[in-house]
Amino acid sequence: MKLLTLNTHSLIEPDYEAKREIFVKFIAAEQPKVFALQEVNQTAAAPLLGDAPAGYYPCPGNRVPLKADNHAAAVARMLEERGVHYYWSWLPAKVGYDIYDEGAAVFSRAPITAAENLLLSKTNDYSNWKTRRTLGVCAGDVWYYTVHMGWWKDEEEPFAAQWETLSQAAGAKQTAFLLGDFNSEADVRGEGYDLILRSGWQDTYRLAQQRDDGYTVVQAIDGWRDAPDAAAKKRIDQIWCSRTVAVKSSRVVFGGLQEPQVSDHAGVLIEL
């Protein structure tokens, strides 16, 4: 089976509609069993969507209604129009760039039977840009979490505290995958990446029989512009599993080589 993660940037991205079309075409062709998206937004002031596309599974505790330009809803609809059906859920975490409801989404080919809404940050202020939530869904007997973490050196909302909450919740499941933007460089020792490893989680990139360099960020992006290594290549988008699994391959997608760039991040596609 194939799993994919992408920090999609969605409505913020220049040429958004054209890039969304490229992404949907790729998903329709590859049909990963599950794909997880971060920075999935909608305009807060937009009209209500009305009826949600087929397969929508509301996340517990989400009081923000779907709006007409919701990125996840648009992706679901466009896939449905191509005859490719996914079950999906969306969870907003905060106000983004002053005008968006920003959150994360998970899409699954198998029916979603449960969903989990995890507050990872200390703050629960929807207007605070440091608020972090994670959406988990159960499909079959496996849980999949779409993850967008804070930074290791953030004194107010440190990565380590957020990881403890996530690891305890996801680690209690029989099998769980964490897919997303961890904001922790795999090449930096003694920080977030090593903490995840020490917690017993398995990096599917390292398990893969075939893999590329894995770098998903190759230029300065929001959240990293003030870092000493702002412009350096980073492998911060990752897929982890709670146990060792056989991974055939792991490759960067939408990095501008095999597929066009559709976001300020590239994505990761693995095959088990």
Mark where each language-model region is.
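Active-site regions of metal-assisted phosphoester/phosphodiester hydrolases
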Residues: 1-34, 58, 80-81, 85-272
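Alpha-helix-centered segments that form part of catalytic cores
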Residues: 66-86
